[in-house]
Amino acid sequence: MQFSKMHGLGNDFVVVDAVTQNIYFPTEVIKRLADRNRGIGFDQLLVVEPPYDPDLDFHYRIFNADGSEVSQCGNGARCFARFVVLKGLTNKKEIAVSTAKGKMMLCVKDDDMVCVNMGEPIWEPNKIPFNANKFEKNYIIRTDIQTLLCGVVSMGNPHCVTQVEDIQHANIEILGPLLESHERFPERVNAGFMQIINRNHIKLRVYERGAGETQACGSGACAAVAVGIMQGVLGSCVQVDLPGGRLMIEWQGKGHPLYMTGEATHIYDGVIRL
């Protein structure tokens, strides 16, 4: 199998062309490839497939290191876009893709930056999915060690965002797993911890479902900004500083798509026997 190793702000991926290669990924194979000591090592595996819809360019699949398939990864989307251009799978700079839960537009810029139209944030609890009677800007979520005030949203995958005073001392190692597997999230959740610097600048750490804390989470950055805007504490254009680097997020509010812009870096190409 031919593959590329890429990263988006330190969130690392193996990207595979399943357009020209006939490849199937059982859970056991994904886990073996994800092993950083015995395999390649990655946070997520990204698979480029032929489009299911003739009006689209590709189908985008994402697998976590534990073998579970998810429907969205913002950092991965940027790497996906750069990959298909680098490998000559398309000569377009604006690329339309489908995912397990919808469609995305990816725009590859000349400076190696990629802008992703992430679509509209989803707030209805049953669509996230999240166990709640109605939408609220803040939900009280009780864990074994702490009661938290959280915003909950889907960016194609579920996110729970809570504000913290100091991102460096947030109890993410304990709270992250408790939120990820909380009973109110039937499909588990990505847990974001946000420190607000000002209305246009936040710091963020994300504990991703199936992967643990990562260097950066693009959909998590989008979710944090969307929650902050809905709660009235952030402006429409926000710089998000993650452990792995910086993203710019823009959202004009309900009825509008949310845009994420950031780097996508190609590290190396390789071949491995499955």
Curated annotation (Swiss-Prot):
Localization annotation: Cytoplasm
The cross-references to Pfam families, in alphabetical order and at most eight, read:
DAP_epimerase
**CC terms in the record's Gene Ontology section:** cytosol
The record's GO molecular-function terms, alphabetically, read: diaminopimelate epimerase activity
For whether the record's keyword set contains Isomerase, the answer is: yes
- What residues does the record give for site: Could be important to modulate the pK values of the two catalytic cysteine residues? H159, E208
Pathways involved? Amino-acid biosynthesis; L-lysine biosynthesis via DAP pathway; DL-2,6-diaminopimelate from LL-2,6-diaminopimelate: step 1/1
Alphabetical list of SUPFAM superfamilies matching this protein:
Diaminopimelate epimerase-like
The UniProt catalytic activity note for this protein reads: (2S,6S)-2,6-diaminopimelate = meso-2,6-diaminopimelate
- Enzyme class comes to isomerase
**Binding positions for substrate?**
N11, Q44, N64, G74, N75, N157, N190, E208, R209, G218, S219
Q: Which PROSITE patterns match?
A: DAP_EPIMERASE (PS01326)
- Its primary localisation, in coarse terms, equals cytoplasm
Enzyme Commission designation? 5.1.1.7
The answer to keyword Transmembrane helix applying to this record is no
The domain of life for this entry's organism is Bacteria
Tell me, what is an example of a GO biological process annotation in this record? lysine biosynthetic process via diaminopimelate
Question: Which keywords does the record carry?
Answer: Amino-acid biosynthesis, Cytoplasm, Isomerase, Lysine biosynthesis
Q: Where is this site: Important for dimerization?
A: Y268
In terms of Gene3D superfamilies, this protein maps to: Diaminopimelate Epimerase, Chain A, domain 1 (3.10.310.10)
Show the active-site residues.
Answer: C73, C217
**Family statement:** Belongs to the diaminopimelate epimerase family.
Which PANTHER family does this UniProt record tie to the protein?
DIAMINOPIMELATE EPIMERASE, DIAMINOPIMELATE EPIMERASE, CHLOROPLASTIC
Write out the function statement from the record: Catalyzes the stereoinversion of LL-2,6-diaminopimelate (L,L-DAP) to meso-diaminopimelate (meso-DAP), a precursor of L-lysine and an essential component of the bacterial peptidoglycan.
- The name of this protein is Diaminopimelate epimerase
Source organism of this protein record: Histophilus somni (strain 2336) (Haemophilus somnus)
- Coding gene? dapF
